[in-house]
Regions:
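TRNA-recognition modules of translation machinery and tRNA-sensing kinases, especially anticodon-binding
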Residues: 1-144
């Protein structure tokens, strides 16, 4: 197990809430679907007015099933470090092949492309909002 200051509080919980986003697409729309999902996550983070970065994972850091993955990290100023809050991946046909998930293409049936991601990991987002939007112990109201 891990121990230390970097794994306490809202950073490492045994259970945490998040919203998953999923798309099932054909090969032609797969890349666009990934971009739409990334744009959605970015719009959520931007609306919270917190610093973030989008990282394209290298092949060595990808999960076994993933073809391409983008991680989103938010900066927690109180901790002076970046916290991963979202990960969006395209698995192409890896998952659909295992569950025989097919879609119609003309008169044929072909394997679908599956994409998924966590919209936002709530504890880390809450921690970052609290650290970013405080002003002399009075929290700014986030409007919108």
């Amino acid at each position: 197990g891990s121990w230390g200051a970097h794994v306490r509080g809202l950073n490492r919980l045994h259970q945490f809430d998040k919203v998953e986003i999923v798309q099932i697409e054909n090969e032609k729309n797969s890349e666009n679907a990934l971009n739409e999902m990334c744009d959605y996550v970015e719009s959520l983070i931007k609306s919270l007015e917190i610093s973030y970065r989008k990282i394209l994972l290298c092949a060595g850091d990808l999960g076994f099933a993933s073809s391409i993955t983008y991680d989103f990290e938010v900066f927690a100023p109180g901790q002076k470090r970046w916290l991963e809050c979202s990960s969006v991946s395209n698995f192409k046909t890896y998952q659909s092949n295992r569950m025989n998930l097919k879609i119609k293409k003309n008169k044929d049936k072909v394997l679908a492309h599956t994409l998924n991601g966590s919209a936002l990991a709530l504890p880390r987002i809450v921690a970052t909002i609290l650290e970013t939007h405080q002003n002399k112990n009075v929290f700014k109201a986030l409007v919108n």
